[in-house]
Amino acid sequence: MVSKPHGGKLIRRIAAPRTRERILSEQHEYPKVQIDHGRAIDLENIAHGVYSPLKGFLTREDFESVLDHMRLSDDTPWTIPIVLDVEKPEFEEGDAILLYHKETPIARMHVEDIYTYEKEEFALKVFKTKDANHPGVAKVYSMGKYLVGGEIELLNELPNPFAKYTLRPIETRVLFKEKGWKTVVAFQTRNVPHLGHEYVQKAALTFVDGLFINPVLGRKKRGDYKDEVIIKAYEVLFEHYYPKDVAVLATVRYEMRYAGPREAIHHAIMRKNFGATHFIVGRDHAGVGNYYGPYEAWDLFDEFPDLGITPMFIREAFYCKKCGGMVNEKICPHDEKYHVRISGTKLRNMIMRGEKPPEYMMRPEVYEVIRSFDNPFVE
């Protein structure tokens, strides 16, 4: 059976059509709060159950419990604070407010809690550093002075150019059941696939019924692959190198926090809500720079025996000239001089120079997809 939703119930916080119509007709009567793109995406993920069991942004009790214990106040595992910040609240506890992204009302929120917090404490506990060069820490330091907690009802979603590739948890759960999959392994990615990724995915697929490739779409930094390139690259990989009906590709919009081990747990919870029973935890999962050890995230899973999804720890793959194929350090006896590490950065630089990567690094069909774009990279 596909996994149970985190907390036992798949959350749905979408305003019914008549309620939505009434709220929008009365929108001038509500206090108005502007939110950024990331919070709008968080609202979608709350509303569609990706963040189950959350029904809204964290109250003080849950926020402090997540910081200190990596659990909600009811002891449910939860590692990343999903919060709404404001600089100066112009409303009170008990009020209903409307959350806007630019001119679009995204959600109604029932204000349960307004509270202050220490930014350095937030940063140190979640990211294990107070260094403002860390992108997640920099984001915390730019937040408003207050946090607002309470349940939400989604009214509108941001435009989604990849809507046809988007599946919600309620849809993936039905799809996995229709395929007869009792076990499903999820793989998160922000890159086009190379042979190292394929090795890890197929190693995991050996032990389960189906593979769920779940690319993260969202704001990217300069030099990253564009979202459409990642999607097209996986489509051609599935067509040529995977058996039919063993893999599903569906995207999710999400703002990366780069919180390393804590975020690895969060990513597993998200995929549990999609119905996955297993989750591939990569090397330096959700890390950035040198803030976390390469396999630090693996150790943190030991603290969550009640997580409800099984982590799969598959070591980084490389090409061995002696073995003549993709291997990892556990199964290859040969000296380092025979190993060719497949670095995403190295591949990206080769492609930028117009060089075709060797076939032991990247499938030629994937390279042709990348080459078909005038500029496959974010500028």
From Swiss-Prot:
Domain of life of the native organism: Archaea
Pathway assigned to this chain's UniProt record: Sulfur metabolism; hydrogen sulfide biosynthesis; sulfite from sulfate: step 1/3
TM regions (residue ranges): none
CDD domains referenced in this protein's UniProt entry, alphabetically: ATPS
Keywords, in A-Z order: ATP-binding, Nucleotide-binding, Nucleotidyltransferase, Transferase
Xref: InterPro entries: ATP-Sase_PUA-like_dom, PUA-like_sf, Rossmann-like_a/b/a_fold, SO4_adenylyltransferase_pro, Sulfurylase_cat_dom, Sulphate_adenylyltransferase
Signal sequence segment: none
Reactions that this protein is recorded to catalyse: sulfate + ATP + H(+) = adenosine 5'-phosphosulfate + diphosphate
Root EC class: transferase
GO BP terms, alphabetized: hydrogen sulfide biosynthetic process; sulfate assimilation
Enzyme Commission number: 2.7.7.4
A GO MF label: ATP binding
Family named by the database record: Belongs to the sulfate adenylyltransferase family.
Family annotation (PANTHER family): PTHR43509, SULFATE ADENYLYLTRANSFERASE
Protein known as: Sulfate adenylyltransferase
UniProt source species: Pyrococcus abyssi (strain GE5 / Orsay)
Organism ancestry: Archaea, Methanobacteriati, Methanobacteriota, Thermococci, Thermococcales
